[in-house]
């Protein structure tokens, strides 16, 4: 029984485990494994915490992005409203300005017509006075009648103007 190889292998194995037990290797091995398990658990907890923090940051940035997009849309809408209002005001101002210029042009035309009519009347009066003077001068004596003619012509000129 002691001469077989299996016996000595078994004896060596038992002795090996006895030596390991004597030096408390199993406790050291268990402590190392427990420490390793605790480290892994701590890393998992840290990973969960970081993941939750990342999700919170992501949600925060998504919320900020939505708010920024809404604000940009509001700004664009406000700009459109202001542009439409400015266009309305500009059209109204242009219409008023066109009306003023049209009125001014019409007034200038009316004034020019009046001036032209007055000029024509004055010229006609001067021509009539000159013609009357020549006709009367040819028919009247040079004496008293000339004074009468001059007086009449002066009155006629003042009445026509």
From Swiss-Prot:
Gene Ontology CC: one annotated term: plasma membrane
UniProt subcellular location: Cell inner membrane
Keywords in alphabetical order: ATP synthesis, Cell inner membrane, Cell membrane, CF(0), Hydrogen ion transport, Ion transport, Membrane, Transmembrane, Transmembrane helix, Transport
Membrane topology: Single-pass membrane protein
Xref: Pfam families: ATP-synt_B
Transmembrane segments: 1-21
GO molecular function terms listed in the Swiss-Prot or TrEMBL record: proton-transporting ATP synthase activity, rotational mechanism; proton-transporting ATPase activity, rotational mechanism
Recorded superkingdom: Bacteria
Complex and partners: F-type ATPases have 2 components, F(1) - the catalytic core - and F(0) - the membrane proton channel. F(1) has five subunits: alpha(3), beta(3), gamma(1), delta(1), epsilon(1). F(0) has three main subunits: a(1), b(2) and c(10-14). The alpha and beta chains form an alternating ring which encloses part of the gamma chain. F(1) is attached to F(0) by a central stalk formed by the gamma and epsilon chains, while a peripheral stalk is formed by the delta and b chains.
Cited function: F(1)F(0) ATP synthase produces ATP from ADP in the presence of a proton or sodium gradient. F-type ATPases consist of two structural domains, F(1) containing the extramembraneous catalytic core and F(0) containing the membrane proton channel, linked together by a central stalk and a peripheral stalk. During catalysis, ATP synthesis in the catalytic domain of F(1) is coupled via a rotary mechanism of the central stalk subunits to proton translocation. Component of the F(0) channel, it forms part of the peripheral stalk, linking F(1) to F(0).
Homology family: Belongs to the ATPase B chain family.
Protein known as: ATP synthase subunit b 1
Organism of provenance: Parvibaculum lavamentivorans (strain DS-1 / DSM 13023 / NCIMB 13966)
Lineage: Bacteria, Pseudomonadati, Pseudomonadota, Alphaproteobacteria, Hyphomicrobiales
